[in-house]
Amino acid sequence: IRIETPDAYLNTLGGALALAADGIWDGQVWLHGAVGWRMPLSGWRAAYTGDALGWHDRARTHFDAYAASQVTEIPNTISHPAQDSVLNLARSEKRWGTPQYSNGYICRNPRNNTQMHHYDMNLCYIDELLWHFNWTGDLEYARQMWPVLVRHLAWEKLNYDPDNDGLYDAYACIWVSDALYYNSGAVTHSSAYNYRANKMAAVIAEKIG
């Protein structure tokens, strides 16, 4: 990747970005980190990398791997609230059939829809997928991934906007910080992600019929 600008310092970034990106690619998915936390996480920010650098094949490989990790055969049978009392209600109870661990949830590791994790990594995974559609304009792939998107949107609504006010709670969905509401809150960042996802879904639905 070459960058050509009048600024000699900016021109060095192409190789640096490509090298860093290649370092977090494990052949199947983008990893959480290159050195520390070198492990897969479905919705970590690394998955924006492929499309930004023109590596759309890697991006699609990542998205396919985690689409196969979406729960599809466990309906929600346990109502809100389903928080873990041992952890002072700070996290969802890890039990299949709760709102979090039911259809639509994307599990922690690629091609494995049986492994719970405490994050809502759905949110950024879907945002990255939608950016992939923006970058590539690949309507056939959008059609293929449509069921994944629909299940995700229903899952987010069930879990994080049960009062239907259009404002979504946040649950460990981006950087885990008290300043960003680790759990609950009807906050701006999770609402903004969901607003964009629903708006993009409407556009995609119109295009794919």
Cite the ranges covered by each PLM segment:
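Substrate-binding groove/exosite segments of carbohydrate-active enzymes
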Residues: R2-W146
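Aromatic-lined carbohydrate-binding surfaces of glycoside hydrolases
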Residues: W37, Q70, L149, E156, ...
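The feature captures the catalytic groove of carbohydrate-active enzymes
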Residues: H32, W96-C124, A154-G209
